[in-house]
């Protein structure tokens, strides 16, 4: 069953080009992760991490549409998923951002992952607001 989790749209105090550049190097993510994320490891195009009750997850950047969105897909994770980071130019100095996580999970697994994923999205967007 396909399940979608979406963050609220927030505003980053950085222009869309600089924000895109920052988010397309996964080594930069460590500076923005919420406390609920543990065991974070990264390279330029890959990262892995653990969130609360969920198994360790791995992401690989698979698509970069300049200044528009970045797609990450699960890589060697127990739960198949992808995550999109959408960037929308607001003005010369700010960018609107929202995240979307798509997972193939059954109803029982959805109930298990819903809270940790929503917490992750909420915490991550709070951090984006502070950029």
Which role fits each region the language model picked out?
Residues 3-9, 46, 56, 82, ...:
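Intrinsic-disorder/low-complexity, polar/charged segments enriched in Ser/Thr/Lys/Arg/Asp/Glu/Gln
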Residues 102-131:
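A conserved amphipathic terminal alpha-helix motif
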Residues 10, 32, 69-70, 115, ...:
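Amphipathic alpha-helical hairpins
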Residues 19-23, 29, 47, 61, ...:
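Hydrophobic pocket/interface hotspot
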Residues 52-94, 102:
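Hydrophobic-ligand binding "helix-grip"
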Residues 1-41:
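Hydrophobic ligand-binding cavity/cleft-lining segments
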Residues 15-21, 53, 112-116, 120:
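Short amphipathic alpha-helical segments
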Residues 41-45, 65-68:
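Ser/Thr- and Asn-enriched, surface-exposed coil loops between beta-strands
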């Amino acid at each position: 069953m396909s399940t979608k989790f979406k963050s609220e749209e927030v505003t980053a105090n950085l222009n869309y080009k600089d924000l895109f550049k920052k988010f397309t190097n996964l080594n930069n993510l460590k500076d923005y992760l919420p406390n609920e994320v543990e065991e974070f490891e990264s390279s330029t195009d890959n990262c892995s991490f653990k969130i609360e009750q969920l198994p360790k997850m791995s992401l690989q950047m698979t698509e970069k549409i300049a200044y528009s969105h970045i797609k990450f897909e699960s890589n060697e994770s127990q739960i198949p998923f992808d995550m999109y980071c959408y960037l929308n130019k607001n003005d010369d100095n700010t960018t609107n951002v929202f995240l979307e996580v798509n997972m193939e999970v059954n109803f029982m697994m959805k109930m298990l992952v819903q809270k940790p994923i929503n917490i992750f999205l909420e915490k991550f967007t709070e951090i984006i607001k502070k950029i």
